[in-house]
Regions:
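Flexible coil/turn and secondary-structure edge motifs
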Residues: 2-6, 15-209
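Small-residue packing motifs within transmembrane alpha-helices
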Residues: 8-10
Length: 209
């Protein structure tokens, strides 16, 4: 009987400790001003193969996904988008760590890897599916995007054609488009060179460091 009594006391003490720990956990709150572990940015800059490759080089970028955004239909295919009838733009959705890279830095990378003077095209690719645009997630991104565009406008005499619009549904592109530059490095380099992308970027922004 005495052994059973101690067992009951032990069980009761264990339950009390669990309740105390649970209450402490519920009362805890995250520190004010802490940043989220990840955030999302979405950019359209012509061929998503190239945009994805450019952002994959940036420290603090967690992942990139090629896809379609800004159109009128759900779940578009590459063939539908490339024909120009859906209103979607080829784009890249970027998941990044705000503690390692700021949204301002991503905007800077974006501008320096597009032709902001081109309307409804980028480099050798023509059509509104290749338009350049910043798709913002929230008012903070919108404000930063507009400030960055204003700075770019001061650099060029011609009007800036890059749109700034709220992000809508993003549809992941077919799997063979994901990390295309990794899966098909020779074809990717051939396309990028013959499209004149880097030559035009150097003309606009100067040589990269």
């Amino acid at each position: 009987m005495q052994r059973l009594g101690w067992r009951r006391i032990g069980v009761g003490l264990s339950l009390w400790l669990v309740l105390v720990a649970s209450a402490a956990g519920q009362g805890a709150s995250p520190q004010a001003g802490t940043q989220p572990a990840s955030a999302v940015a979405t950019f359209a800059g012509g061929c998503f193969w190239c945009v994805e490759a450019d952002f994959d080089k940036v420290a603090g970028v967690i992942s990139t996904t090629s896809g379609y955004i800004g159109g009128r239909s759900a779940n578009p295919t590459y063939d539908e988008v490339s024909r120009g009838g859906t209103g979607h733009a080829e784009a890249v959705e970027i998941v990044y760590d705000p503690a390692e890279v700021s949204y301002q830095k991503l905007l800077d990378v974006f501008w320096h890897n597009i032709d902001p003077l081109a309307k409804d095209r980028q480099f050798c690719d023509h059509g509104d599916q290749y338009r350049s645009a910043i798709f913002y997630h929230g008012e903070e991104q919108r404000s930063l995007a507009e400030a960055s565009k204003a700075a770019v406008e001061k650099r060029f005499k011609q009007p800036i054609q890059t749109a700034i619009v709220a992000a809508g549904p993003f549809y992941k592109a077919e799997e063979y488009h994901q990390d295309y530059y990794v899966k098909n490095p020779i074809r990717y380099k051939f396309y990028r060179f013959n499209c004149g992308r880097d030559a035009r970027l150097e003309e606009l922004w100067g040589k990269k460091d």
